[in-house]
Amino acid sequence: MLRQLVGDAVTIPVILKFYMADQNIRDTVYGKKKFRFSSEQAINIAVTVVSVAALGIAVNNIIAMTSLIQASEGFQTANQAFFAGAAVYEFLGSCFLIPIAEELLFRGVVYQRLKLMLGVAPAIICSALIFGLVHANLVQFLYAAVLGCLLAFLYEKTGFFYVPVLGHIAANTEIGRAHV
């Protein structure tokens, strides 16, 4: 997990550069979206974050009811390696840095670029499938693809990048909490 943590810490600034360049182009073409934070928005964000975490739990429970986890050597290996480190590294990595890095890449860059080429719905589906594929085993593919669809949808509906980031952090934290 320490290697993953360091890798994400190094990767985030690189992906952030691409995200910011794309964002500057979008702001120039479509105009800059103003950030307004109200109590209503805070409630909506809280409900959204809890909903994403609940979806993560639901998808994990559905997958657990099948024989996929036992049948997937790739998942077993990845899970053992992922949760083999110290708890502080697991928390910082899986609950904070990894969601930020993945959201920058998959919703911030991949989804936004696919949306320009394909439109909203195909971009949501394609970016979610790509997000699932990079998780490299069937169990995590299913979980990540479902979560990826929801996160891209939330990003599209709200227009604010922090919404899928907070949702992803909540989902990973809830899953991580189950392993601690």
Which residues does each predicted region cover?
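Membrane-interface helix/loop boundary segments of multi-pass membrane proteins
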Residues: 101-126, 153-160
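Functionally important transmembrane alpha-helices
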Residues: 128, 140-177
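Hydrophobic alpha-helical transmembrane segments
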Residues: 2, 42-50, 88, 92, ...
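Active-site His/Glu-centered metal-binding helix of metallohydrolases
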Residues: 100, 104-105, 109-110, 137, ...
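Alpha-helical transmembrane segments in multi-pass membrane proteins
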Residues: 1-24, 43, 47
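Membrane-embedded alpha-helical segments of multi-pass membrane proteins
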Residues: 5-13, 88, 92, 142-149, ...
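Juxtamembrane helix-loop-helix connectors linking adjacent transmembrane helices
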Residues: 27-104, 112, 116
